[in-house]
Amino acid sequence: MTYLLALDQGTSSSRSIVFDERGHIVAQAQLELPQIYPQPGWVEHDPLEIWRTQIATARDALAKAGIAANAVRAVGITNQRETTVLWNRKTGQPVHHAIVWQDRRAEPACAQLREQGHAATIQAKTGLLIDAYFSGTKLQWLLDHVPGARDAAEAGELAFGTVDSWLIWQLTGGKRHVTDVSNASRTMLFNVHTNQWDDELLQLLRIPRALMPEVLPSASDFGATDAALLGGPIAIGGVAGDQQSALFGQACFTAGMAKNTYGTGCFMLMHTGSRFQKSENGLLTTSAAQAGQSPEYAMEGSVFVGGAVVQWLRDGLRAISASSEVQALAESVPDSGGVMMVPAFTGLGAPYWKPDARGTITGLTRGTTIAHIARAALESIAYQSAALLAAMSRDAVAAGGAPVSELRVDGGACVNDLLMQFQADLLGIPVVRPAVVETTALGAAYLAGLASGVYASTDELSALWQAERRFTPTLPRSQAEALMARWEHAVAQAVLPG
């Protein structure tokens, strides 16, 4: 039996999963990652803790699987994107905590870039909107605020990387300073047309090129693990940012295929093939995970509050005592009784981009019960995702493509059958849940398997991918469209005047 080891380094935890060559989970291990909040709006991780927890889970997963390093054909890495690490090349020690993707300290630098009129150039080169979310301005902040960092960077003494680069550096004993195209595309410094760091953008943000890692396709030779770490060397063959890895793990390899990850928020990506498509609907264009040399792209949009609305029902309203109870409560009524919830607790993300919107519950009557509110809360996840998919399809059609014909789903909330059926009803297309819902880690394993010859092509991976359940629409389109119109009316009410 051939095995693949996926390292899945996330915002709140580090995980490792051993897969067999059929893509089935053999063993897994997980450790929580401490969050550091130095002041409001700032979020950091200790890079040494990222490394400690990740290597510990890798050892644990191999032990649970009962296999030695020589049974593992290759390692794949997937990671929280945009999080920024800066370290000393000689010592391998970080010069500061990692600045996490949620961190907003670089907002003044982003505002300055917008005011100077750089938005169009940055979007044309990178596919991204100027935002503190991305790595470029985080790295700029580190160079400007860590004593001696800029001089050391210009002297070639420091290395920058997203979390994948940091892990590869540690895994290879400092031999390789590399990243993949999908992670590089989240820095605001990478030209997604040429697949290279962009000198104009590096100069604009005053980033020395000597800092930057080599960029490789997502299925490549990223080096090998130091023999002392896992009991023998293992080739590192696959790397991709978490959302692109999930798209790959869902076997969405061709233009028009899309996936939605239902987590705390929702992340939707649609593959656009070799077509770089600038969104007219507030979506990002990003590099997809690439198995070959040619650039491939995806459109991306995110919903801020997805499964988090269920946590709010539990912790805020105390309507349920455990998240698992929400489906039964919502199913105790035939519909929401006209209640609409817009969970704009932190504004609305794509495709609305209304940061000032606030949450609303409308359509209340004397007959409204907590069950109606629970159902409206659950349905709000589907409404937001439907609005996002409609925006993606509009962009695709405008660029000469076809609208999305089915949506593949993963993430914690995709196990909720009521939500998935309502999602299919709103979209008017099938919603498909895979047999293996750990698609983010699976994508990294697939990429590693391609690079190491376990799989011959993505066609082989498409044949391996299996659906666990297919939800087909049961609602007439006229009814679904009427519901979406009511949703859009509720969204308009969530944006307060003033």
From Swiss-Prot:
One of its GO terms (biological process) is glycerol metabolic process. Glycerol binds at residues 81-82, 133, 242-243. It comes from the Bacteria. Pfam families: FGGY_C, FGGY_N. Inhibited by fructose 1,6-bisphosphate (FBP). Its EC number is 2.7.1.30. ADP binds at residues 11, 15, 264, 307, 412, 416. ATP binds at residues 11-13, 264, 307, 311, 412. One of its GO terms (cellular component) is cytosol. InterPro entries: ATPase_NBD, Carb_kinase_FGGY, Carb_kinase_FGGY_CS, FGGY_C, FGGY_N, Glycerol_kin. It catalyses: glycerol + ATP = sn-glycerol 3-phosphate + ADP + H(+). Pathway: Polyol metabolism; glycerol degradation via glycerol kinase pathway; sn-glycerol 3-phosphate from glycerol: step 1/1. Disulfide bonds: none annotated. CDD domains: FGGY_EcGK_like (cd07786). Sn-glycerol 3-phosphate binds at residues 11, 81-82, 133, 242. Key enzyme in the regulation of glycerol uptake and metabolism. Catalyzes the phosphorylation of glycerol to yield sn-glycerol 3-phosphate. This is Glycerol kinase. It comes from Acidovorax sp. (strain JS42). The gene is glpK.
